[in-house]
Amino acid sequence: WCFNVEYLVERERGFAYQEDLFQPGQFEIRLVPGKPVFLTASTEALQTEHGHNVIGEIWRREVERRMGLAASSESLEGHLAREGERFLVRRPDGGLAVTAGYHWFGSWGRDTLIALPGLTFYAGRPEEGTDVLLGLGSAVRDGLIPNVFSADGNHAYNSADASLWYVWAVQQMLKALPDRKGLIRERCWPVIKNIIEHYGGGKVPFVAPDAEGFLSVGNPGTQLTWMDAVANGRPVTPRHGQPVEISALWYNALAFADSLAKAFGEPEWRRTKQLDAMRSVFFKRYWVTDERGDYLADVWRDGGVETCVRPNQLFALSLPYPVLDEERYASVLSRVRRCLLTPYGLRTLAPSAPGYRPLYEGGPAERDEAYHQGTVWPWLLGAYGEAVLRAAWDVPGSVRELLRTIRPLFAQHLGDAGIGSVSEIFDGDPPHLPNGCIAQAWSVAECLRLLHLLKEAAPGVYAEWEANARKGGN
């Protein structure tokens, strides 16, 4: 026996960190010069009497593969596309699913839908992406996409936004694969109509449409958005009411449905006048002006607003159908850039706000308190990049500035934590140490999609930046 073995990371995270380990025996092997030795453990039997030859061939191929990668000029997009394949897993029924993160996350609806375009449609895996998207559509129940999937089929439907992210994922598939419009009409359009019918008709638990067409979600005891941490039995970031990204996602869903209804000849699903009115209402409700400029409130509730500066406002600019008027983009981006942007992603709360947590550390409760209270999330860079491109009057200059800012994420972090991958989160304060899962699906996916967008917008600037980043320059 080996007694009192300690696990330092578990101790840091406030978990049980000591155990006794049984040692059943030992292997003694006499080494002979020039003769290989293999110590092999597997859950499957080797289908040959010469198992050592099989293992040797596997080893040789893997060595060649790694040496080839080290010597290649693989692009950052190509690298992230390859890393993204790790998150695509087979379910027991043979279908594809997305694992949210390694080592301890399962398959979640929201994470899957946000990660799917970067993992598949923009990574050369269109069939895999279509498979996952159609599978999610078949799991819709009363307008809701499951938030957490379980092996026994008893999925959890405890989110207000997963279904709205489904609409966004369909939009991304159509953008990347315009030849799939027929498939969208046949398989996705009925799902979108089901979602809109239930959300707009007040048929979804904890979701109620108001007279102006926006959605109120939850109550003080619920956590139905992506900022869903709970500590000591209460939501850490209460966002009941009308969270800004829910309003933006809902408007985007209605506007996309309006365009599909026009294309498919279904006028009963057109909402052009309602959409025009909603844009005006949105601005009046969420626009905040203070001594540091203008931005969007995080939540509108009972006629008042939560004025803390958070990154969720970006979705009012970045979605395919933005609910915010274009002339307001620059003000929002200026505030987000000054308060939230870091080299590794966006903070979830401005450092000047009460409740800001600079470090993600301590036991489970302490870490949950920091999870969305300043902690940096790389996946938000996708929305930030889209917003930057939408607002830019000098596209090459804006792309150059953003690439220069986030260079450490690609030039340094890919060699840290989960080597080659992108972590789930980082500390809010410098040096922004990585934390959480060492490889997170939507971090990898949205970073890949961001690079794709920036390369497409300014190919010369991007090529120069990538070449310099490989050499260790700026």
What are these regions (language model features)?
Residues 1-474:
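Acidic, mature catalytic/reactive cores of soluble proteins
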